């Protein structure tokens, strides 16, 4: 079944006739493939590996190089990510470039008029399925350089490390309180293979590597900007580690002595438990004998029962009024 956004686009198929089309943003279905016979060519650019791995010929990357007669951009709740991607697309487009922007109202798509007004003409052309569809024509090209989008931060909890992050990465500008609590449970005695799952900008894995130099660090995430950020955080701090894309355990090989995570429980603007449920239910198959799963979570989330079902006893290593750090052994 196609998304609400794609259902609105289906009402405007004449836009696609005979054109080369680039789909980008938060696309989550196979709508582009259904237009193969209508368009002269189709490209898809996504920064989400959980989508890219399920579709054919998706460009999974931070930066995209290419042009098309028509760009279709699926708006997301992550405004920093939206701005980062749209500026990229506009910077390499030609004057007169045609763009359709589609998004759910609850995700803030209405702000597209203010976002794109400095660069051309924009008008709302449809409203249905609780979505808005906008047509944009480029008149003033912006300038894009990746180096201008990097943010950095430091924090007493992370010693002398500097964390690097791109737009859209979780807790991009400062250390979040959940991760800070999780880091308070880390000592300098961690050994063996460590998996920082859902690594974001790489703060957890980097802190472990800095304090336990013999630990072998692997970092994974589904977000292209997070992976690029984790790479840079490691390299700029002269730390060694492996970083690659995986949707929870989809591309994980081997077993680990410690799997550690501040797992996401938001999917766009909804609370979604799929990722953390897979993390807890499948972790034992990726842990060495005696290995540990350690996660931080909002105290109200129903993870204790899942942990009990799949591991038996669990331990709370640290807690505040809002967060708890859980530990289970294989």
From Swiss-Prot:
Pfam families according to UniProt: MTS, MTS_N
The keyword S-adenosyl-L-methionine is assigned to this record: yes
Keywords attached to this entry: Cytoplasm, Methyltransferase, rRNA processing, S-adenosyl-L-methionine, Transferase
Reaction(s) catalysed (UniProt annotation): guanosine(1207) in 16S rRNA + S-adenosyl-L-methionine = N(2)-methylguanosine(1207) in 16S rRNA + S-adenosyl-L-homocysteine + H(+)
Gene3D superfamilies, per database record: Vaccinia Virus protein VP39 (3.40.50.150)
Record-listed E.C. numbers: 2.1.1.172
Listed InterPro entries: DNA_methylase_N6_adenine_CS, Mtase_sm_N, rRNA_ssu_MeTfrase_C, RsmC/RlmG, SAM-dependent_MTases_sf, Small_mtfrase_dom
A GO cellular-component term linked to this record: cytoplasm
Enzyme class: transferase
Keyword check for Glycoprotein: no
Location in or out of the cell: Cytoplasm
GO molecular function terms noted in the UniProt entry: 16S rRNA (guanine(1207)-N(2))-methyltransferase activity; nucleic acid binding
Protein's job: Specifically methylates the guanine in position 1207 of 16S rRNA in the 30S particle.
Subunit note: Monomer.
Protein family membership: Belongs to the methyltransferase superfamily. RsmC family.
Protein name as annotated: Ribosomal RNA small subunit methyltransferase C
């Amino acid at each position: 079944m196609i998304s609400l956004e794609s259902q609105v686009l289906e009402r405007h198929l004449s836009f696609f006739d005979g054109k080369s089309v680039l789909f980008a943003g938060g696309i989550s279905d196979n709508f582009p493939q259904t237009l193969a016979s209508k368009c002269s060519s189709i490209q898809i650019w996504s920064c989400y590996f959980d989508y890219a791995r399920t579709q054919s010929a998706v460009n999974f990357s931070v930066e995209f190089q290419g042009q098309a007669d028509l760009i279709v951009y699926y708006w997301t709740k992550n405004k920093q990510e939206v701005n980062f991607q749209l500026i990229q697309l506009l910077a390499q487009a030609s004057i007169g470039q045609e763009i359709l922007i589609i998004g759910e109202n609850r995700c803030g798509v209405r702000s597209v008029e203010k976002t794109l007004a400095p660069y051309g003409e924009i008008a709302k052309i449809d409203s249905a399925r609780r979505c808005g569809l906008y047509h944009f024509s480029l008149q003033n090209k912006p300038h894009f350089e990746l180096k201008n989008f990097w943010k950095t931060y430091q924090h007493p909890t992370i010693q002398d490390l500097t964390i690097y992050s791109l737009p859209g990465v979780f807790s991009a500008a400062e250390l979040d309180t959940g991760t800070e609590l999780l880091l308070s449970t880390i000592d300098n005695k961690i050994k063996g293979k460590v998996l920082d799952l859902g690594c974001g900008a790489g703060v957890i894995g980097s802190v472990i590597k800095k304090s336990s130099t013999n630990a072998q660090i692997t970092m994974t995430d589904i977000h292209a900007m997070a992976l690029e950020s984790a790479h840079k955080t490691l390299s700029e701090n002269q730390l060694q580690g492996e970083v690659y894309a995986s949707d929870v355990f989809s591309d994980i090989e081997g077993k680990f002595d410690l799997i550690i995570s501040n797992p996401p429980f938001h999917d766009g603007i909804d609370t979604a438990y799929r990722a953390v449920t897979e993390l807890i239910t499948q972790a034992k198959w990726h842990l060495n004998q005696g290995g540990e799963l350690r996660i931080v979570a909002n105290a109200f989330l129903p993870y204790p029962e899942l942990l009990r079902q799949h591991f038996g006893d669990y331990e709370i290593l640290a807690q505040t009024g809002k967060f708890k750090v859980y530990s289970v052994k294989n």
